[in-house]
Every structure is written in structure tokens, then in C-alpha cells.
């Protein structure tokens, strides 16, 4: 596809199968786990496996493949086993992505576990200040994902994300993945034209739109400021279709990857349904309208 719309794809049977799966459902971009997302240790692909993955990527004609780190990682954890395992796992993620040729990693910033926001952010920054120099061959970008703010999770405010980026020794290596479900659940209302303009103006002021490098497009089963992360099919949750219409017609984000993480079925049916829903929201506009960056 010519657009930058896609979905998270399974790596069952080998990561090399993911590009064709994405192509089959009509993706222009895809996201993958590079290992089992619920295990600490993952297998490093051989040179041959990595070459096959890159060949399949090219054959599928995808603009980009983005990696998502495993869910177990918590770089905000205090010193101890979880932090040690998290550092090792993220380092391995960077190494795998280097071998595979993937230059973008999405990650959840972490949870402070009751030690406070400031302490958690400091620990995240300290972790990255160790990790970036440890894997110099990874020259890509790490995307901090906006979170719903469940429990003690960090990343549910733009201020927190800005503090993490500014607090590292390598701010140029970091950007943001904007998850629509998470951000809405965290209290940012972009379901109206006015709200949409306000939220992205605030993002631009605190972080910069140049650092918005990926969207996770998900509707939400829960309401505004619920602090609960529950994804729903596009247009069938509490967000509704309007914010997705705004995003799909915002020229500032035309070439920013937009990845579905909506519920899966037994086959490709739901991914195809959600991709079609989003593409139907794109409207034909005049040249004058295309110069207007925000929804009317």
C-alpha cells in the first residue's frame, strides 16, 4: 500500500513471515515483537534468518517495520532482579533489531512501583544512559509510548515523556508513539475538533511534533480519564470515529506510521475491517484545505 497505515503482525513460525502477513491484509507498515513478548530471553536471529527477514520485507513493499519491546521490561524498577532483567532484555532487543535491520523500537516507559514519579523517571533515564552506549551498533530511535496511567505506570502525561527525553544524555535518540486509546484513557480529550487542536498543540509545546514518530490507532472500551487500558475496534468504543477522521486527514501525519493494535480474530478479518474503516475516513480535499493542518 502507498499509505503508512498498518497493524501489529504475528511472528508465529518465524519473524520472516510477518511482512507477507502484513502485505496480505493491505498494510503499508507493520509492527512486530522480535521475540515472545511474555518471556525475558529471546533468540538472536542468525545472519541467515535476518537476511531472509529483510528479503521478505522488501518483497512485501512495506515502508517500515517497527519493533515493540516485550511487556515484562520495566526500566523504572528499583535495583534488583526485575531491573537487571529489564536492562538485559532491552539490550538484547536493540541487538536483535540491529541484526534484523529494524531502526525503530516502541517501548512502555515503565512503572515506579510506589517510589514516585520523579524517582521512576530518573531510573528510566539512568537505564538509557547505560543502554545506548552499550549497543553502539543500534543507531535507530526509541519511541516512548503514551500510556493510560494504570497503577504506577509512567508516560501518561506529555510532561513525563518530555522529562524522560530531556533527562537522558542522548535526547536525539528518543521520540514518542502516540497511542490513541492510552492517551484518551489518560485524560486527553481529542474527540472534537477543538479538543484535537488543543491536545496536539500541547504535545507540540511540551515535546514537539517532530518527535511524534508513530501512532497506535485503537479505540477504547473505557472512558476519558479512566486510566484503564482496554483496546476496541475503530469506531466501536468510547472514542468513536471523529478523532480517527481528524488523524487520517491531518497532513502533518501523512507519513507517520499508524499501527492498529485492535482485537484480533482467528484470521485476518478484524485487521482488514479496521484498516478499511480508517481508509474510508480519508476525504478528498481541495488544495486550500490541504494547507490547513487542523480539523475544521
Curated annotation (Swiss-Prot):
Pfam families from the UniProt entry: AP_endonuc_2
Presence of the UniProt keyword Nuclease in the record: yes
Catalytic activity: Endonucleolytic cleavage to 5'-phosphooligonucleotide end-products
UniProt: Zn(2+) 1 binding residues: 68, 108, 145
Gene3D superfamilies xref list: Divalent-metal-dependent TIM barrel enzymes
Amino acids binding Zn(2+) 2: 145, 179, 216, 261
GO terms for biological process, alphabetical: base-excision repair
Cofactor (UniProt): Zn(2+)
InterPro entries given in the database record: AP_endonuc_2, AP_endonuc_F2_Zn_BS, Xyl_isomerase-like_sf, Xyl_isomerase-like_TIM-brl
UniProt keyword annotations, A-Z: DNA damage, DNA repair, Endonuclease, Hydrolase, Metal-binding, Nuclease, Zinc
Cofactor: binding details: Binds 3 Zn(2+) ions.
Enzyme Commission number: 3.1.21.2
Biological role stated in the UniProt entry: Endonuclease IV plays a role in DNA repair. It cleaves phosphodiester bonds at apurinic or apyrimidinic (AP) sites, generating a 3'-hydroxyl group and a 5'-terminal sugar phosphate.
Entry-linked PANTHER family: APURINIC-APYRIMIDINIC ENDONUCLEASE, ENDONUCLEASE IV ENDODEOXYRIBONUCLEASE IV
Family: Belongs to the AP endonuclease 2 family.
Name this polypeptide is given: Probable endonuclease 4
Annotated source species: Geobacter sulfurreducens (strain ATCC 51573 / DSM 12127 / PCA)
